[in-house]
Amino acid sequence: QLGLASLRSIVQAFMAAHPGGMALLATNSLETPVLGLIARADGRRFVLSEVRERLARAAQRLQLGNFGIGDEFALLGAFVAGPQALRQFAGDAPVNTDDHPVVAYRAPRMTYAPDSLPRERLIALLRELKTEPAELFDAGADAAWSQRLAAYWKARDRFIEAGQHVRPDADVARMLLQVREPLMAVLRTSPEFRPAYDPLLRMATALARTDAAAARALLTELNRLQPARPEAGLALSRLAGSAP
């Protein structure tokens, strides 16, 4: 519902109130992308050890997987910008205020006479926003973790860009022709990026009913790329057990 010009004014106003502001994607949806602007009251970065402690406490009360938070990367991988990137994005856009409501006048135009699709605006936004993990998170001496998070962010952006060209198809073999290599490329960038792993796993399971050899090849590749996840290995075992 928003064009990038309106978003720049919103970000400008947010950063005026919260100089340490950050942005994250609420979903990876191409049709209805949702960007969240958040800030900490103390203006500090997030400390990785504290984030892990809070996630562990929350997991005692909630099934975090039901909220799409399978691990810390599923949560922290949603961030797309820190303060510096947001300031650069806002540039010299006019601040949206009560007495200068530029968004209220601009936003309807994007709804009634759009000049682009939501997916196109999302991809354009992600291409503008460049942030390093160290700007948002204090990982202590764990440099490898910061590299993994940066790889996750890169994989997320590649996943979103690849999705813009996909056309849904009820035939799993035809669907795999579209998405297999793009999703595998995403997993090679970051094996921890579940939104690429999960659909391939589901399609391999469906494919096993009609083409066991192709399903086995796909599951083997998934298991090689992400051995830390058990699902592909278990599916391979079931497939072997059902072979004549």
Give residue spans per PLM region.
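Conserved Class I S-adenosyl-L-methionine
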Residues: 3-25
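Soluble small-group transferase modules, centered on the S-adenosyl donor enzyme superfamily
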Residues: 23-185, 190-195, 199
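TPR/TPR-like alpha-solenoid repeats
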Residues: 164, 203-206, 239-242
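Short coil/turn linking the two alpha-helices of tandem helical-hairpin repeats
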Residues: 167-171, 204-211, 230
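Alpha-helical repeat scaffolds
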Residues: 175-186, 211-223, 244
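Heptad-repeat amphipathic alpha-helical coiled-coil interaction surface used
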Residues: 180, 200, 216, 236-237
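Boundary/linker segments of alpha-helical solenoid repeat arrays
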Residues: 191-198, 225-236
